[in-house]
């Protein structure tokens, strides 16, 4: 086993997956520091991400691996993966191509609460979801 494989093994053994075999992953733009999204990873998706340096997650609703940008083309190139002190949350620093959010915004955190408790759009719309995913029935 070479040193790189040994480091990967050590990292994977450090991750504390929950009872469903998942760990939350916060995704951040590696240049600006802007938080783009939160997704879930299982061991297989994390291994794929480490190997290919393309963000791959676990879709809880579809119950399958989800290569980010597979349908939309809005891929995430992974620069770094950090792990928190408890080993139960990951931070992926990525280069985002297009929008990270499936509703078309650069970040999934595109709304903020105003003092009157109403919502305000605070991000850039990058694409029309109907153009990418088709119309919902």
Swiss-Prot record:
User: Cross-referenced HAMAP family, in alphabetical order?
Assistant: HisI
Q: How is the cofactor bound?
A: Binds 1 Mg(2+) ion per subunit. Binds 1 zinc ion per subunit.
On whether Cell wall biogenesis/degradation is a keyword of this UniProt record, the answer is no
Q: What does the record list as GO biological process?
A: L-histidine biosynthetic process
What this chain does, per the record? Catalyzes the hydrolysis of the adenine ring of phosphoribosyl-AMP.
Its recorded name reads Phosphoribosyl-AMP cyclohydrolase
So what EC number does this one have?
Answer: 3.5.4.19
> Which reaction(s) does the protein catalyse, per the Swiss-Prot or TrEMBL entry?
1-(5-phospho-beta-D-ribosyl)-5'-AMP + H2O = 1-(5-phospho-beta-D-ribosyl)-5-[(5-phospho-beta-D-ribosylamino)methylideneamino]imidazole-4-carboxamide
Q: Which gene encodes it?
A: hisI
- Record family assignment: Belongs to the PRA-CH family.
The entry's keywords = Amino-acid biosynthesis, Cytoplasm, Histidine biosynthesis, Hydrolase, Magnesium, Metal-binding, Zinc
Query: Which SUPFAM superfamilies does this chain map to?
Result: HisI-like
What InterPro entries does its record include? PRA-CH, PRib_AMP_CycHydrolase_dom, PRib_AMP_CycHydrolase_sf
Q: Which cofactor does it need?
A: Mg(2+); Zn(2+)
Which GO molecular function entries does the Swiss-Prot or TrEMBL record give? magnesium ion binding; phosphoribosyl-AMP cyclohydrolase activity; zinc ion binding
Residues annotated as binding Mg(2+) = 84, 86, 88
> Could you describe the subunit structure of this protein?
Homodimer.
Q: Give compartment(s).
A: Cytoplasm
Pathway entry = Amino-acid biosynthesis; L-histidine biosynthesis; L-histidine from 5-phospho-alpha-D-ribose 1-diphosphate: step 3/9
Signal peptide boundaries:
none
Specify which residues bind Zn(2+) according to the UniProt entry for this protein. 85, 101, 108
Q: Which GO terms describe its cellular component?
A: cytoplasm
Pfam families hit by this protein: PRA-CH
